[in-house]
């Protein structure tokens, strides 16, 4: 068995380099919610140094709120913004001698695309237009995954080690007090259930079926490094290879 372990990076956190020694894929902020040309370049260089797959992490234009504010933008606007962000990172990756491999939207762009078919389609079309070989990462079972499949992209269904789930398979909003998982043991047990048994226990106690191609540990989370180390150790014990897919 194998699994991809990814982290959102280039967002101004101090643990990026340490995380890159534990994960197999990096989602690099492209300037709309965090990061700039210099942080993008440094993140790319570190990812190449540690052999980590490089992906873009595009967002709504919302630096003030870290990309976590809901926005109702026309699909054509979102399309253009995603193309812009992917192009910026792709150019840096190319200059540094690497290859951009995947795209994972950030924050509210990710969450809204999980349930909004029109927004999801705009993102998928933008990714395909930039490079049809890019993998599109989205919430397992979401509209974004369906949109990517419809336009012919390779998709990767994502699950979260450090977030609680709702009964419909979406994430508990960060505005709620029980949204984040802060216990290593709980993060570990939830992740193993998703990877090995293809299910996750929702906040109401029910079980939701999920496909886990890649597991996210948020780079800005207080427990990010601890979670990543714990997961790597347990995956090794369980005979699960951590590798970008």
From Swiss-Prot:
Keywords: ATP-binding, Hydrolase, Nucleotide-binding. One of its GO terms (biological process) is carbohydrate metabolic process. It catalyses: 5-oxo-L-proline + ATP + 2 H2O = L-glutamate + ADP + phosphate + H(+). It comes from the Bacteria. InterPro entries: Glyco_hydro/deAcase_b/a-brl (IPR011330), LamB/YcsF/PxpA-like (IPR005501). Catalyzes the cleavage of 5-oxoproline to form L-glutamate coupled to the hydrolysis of ATP to ADP and inorganic phosphate. This is 5-oxoprolinase subunit A. The lineage of its organism: Bacteria, Pseudomonadati, Pseudomonadota, Gammaproteobacteria, Enterobacterales. One of its GO terms (molecular function) is ATP binding. Its EC number is 3.5.2.9. Gene3D superfamilies: Glycoside hydrolase/deacetylase. Forms a complex composed of PxpA, PxpB and PxpC. Belongs to the LamB/PxpA family. HAMAP family: PxpA (MF_00691). It comes from Yersinia pestis. The keyword Nucleotide-binding applies.
């Amino acid at each position: 068995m194998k699994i991809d372990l990814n982290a959102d990076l280039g967002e101004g956190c101090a643990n990026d380099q340490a995380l890159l020694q534990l994960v197999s894929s990096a989602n690099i902020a492209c300037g709309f919610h965090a990061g700039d040309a210099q942080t993008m370049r440094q993140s790319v260089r570190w990812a190449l140094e540690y052999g980590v797959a490089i992906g873009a992490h595009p967002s709504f234009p919302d630096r003030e709120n870290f990309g976590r504010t809901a926005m109702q933008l026309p699909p054509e606007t979102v399309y253009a913004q995603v193309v812009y962000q992917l192009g910026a990172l792709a150019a840096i990756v190319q200059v540094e001698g690497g290859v951009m491999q995947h795209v994972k939207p950030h924050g509210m762009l990710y969450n809204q695309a999980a349930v909004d078919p029109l927004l999801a389609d705009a993102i998928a079309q933008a990714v395909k237009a930039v490079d049809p070989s890019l993998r599109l990462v989205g919430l397992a079972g979401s509209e974004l995954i369906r949109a990517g499949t419809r336009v012919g992209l390779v998709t990767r269904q994502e699950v979260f080690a450090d977030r609680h789930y709702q009964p419909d398979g979406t994430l508990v909003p960060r505005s709620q007090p029980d949204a984040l998982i802060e216990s290593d043991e709980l993060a570990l047990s939830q992740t193993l259930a998703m990877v090995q048994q293809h299910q996750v226990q929702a906040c109401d106690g029910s079980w939701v079926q999920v496909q886990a191609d890649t597991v996210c540990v948020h780079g800005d989370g207080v427990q990010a490094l601890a979670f990543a180390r714990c997961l790597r150790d347990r995956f090794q014990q369980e005979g699960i290879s951590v590798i970008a897919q």
